Structures are given as structure tokens and as C-alpha cells.
Amino acid sequence: MAKKSMIQRELKREKLVAKYAQKRAEFKAIILDINSTEEQIWKAQIKLQKLPVNSSASRVQRRCKVTGRPHAVYRKFGLCRNKLREYAMAGDVPGLKKASW
């Protein structure tokens, strides 16, 4: 089980990403626009750098919804490999069955 502080830190990051997503997208659009002048691009880069570091989507790490484990988390289920196996063997994940060939 992950520490509660680590789980809360990830939740805080997710909130920051949602809060600044619009601004971040606008600045990136200006930077990537071919018609933007060098001065506009430069100002947009400065503003983008002044945003909080944790407002970047790449800073958010997927965690298991049950244990908070940060590694081996399946996106489709939101569970780590250990809990996914445990729930699958108990029949709690609909449509999932053990492979056999």
C-alpha cells in the first residue's frame, strides 16, 4: 500500500493539470503556429515556463485505484498487476478470463 501522502500528491497534480490545461494548450498553439512571429513565440515560451511544473500532464503517474501502487498499472482497469490477478481469479472483472492455449 502506498503512503497516503503520495496518493494525495498525485491527486494534487491531476487537479493542477486540469486547471492549467487550457492555458498550456494556448501557449503551445502559439509556439507551434507557423504564422507566429519570433517575439510571440518567445513570450509564449516564457509564459509556459512560468506555469507550475506539476501542471504538466507528463508529471502525473498512474496509480492503482486499490493499493496506490505506481508500477505495473493497467490503464484499461486502473489496477496494478497484483490486484488485477487477484480480482480476475475471484471473477470480479467481467469479461476477463485466464488465457489457455
Curated annotation (Swiss-Prot):
Keywords: Ribonucleoprotein, Ribosomal protein, RNA-binding, rRNA-binding. The keyword RNA-binding applies. PROSITE patterns: RIBOSOMAL_S14. It comes from the Bacteria. One of its GO terms (biological process) is translation. InterPro entries: Ribosomal_uS14, Ribosomal_uS14_bac/plastid, Ribosomal_uS14_CS. SUPFAM superfamilies: Glucocorticoid receptor-like (DNA-binding domain). GO terms for molecular function: rRNA binding; structural constituent of ribosome. GO terms for cellular component: cytoplasm; small ribosomal subunit. Belongs to the universal ribosomal protein uS14 family. HAMAP family: Ribosomal_uS14_1 (MF_00537). PANTHER family: 30S RIBOSOMAL PROTEIN S14, SMALL RIBOSOMAL SUBUNIT PROTEIN US14M. Part of the 30S ribosomal subunit. Contacts proteins S3 and S10. Binds 16S rRNA, required for the assembly of 30S particles and may also be responsible for determining the conformation of the 16S rRNA at the A site. This is Small ribosomal subunit protein uS14. It comes from Francisella tularensis subsp. holarctica (strain FTNF002-00 / FTA).
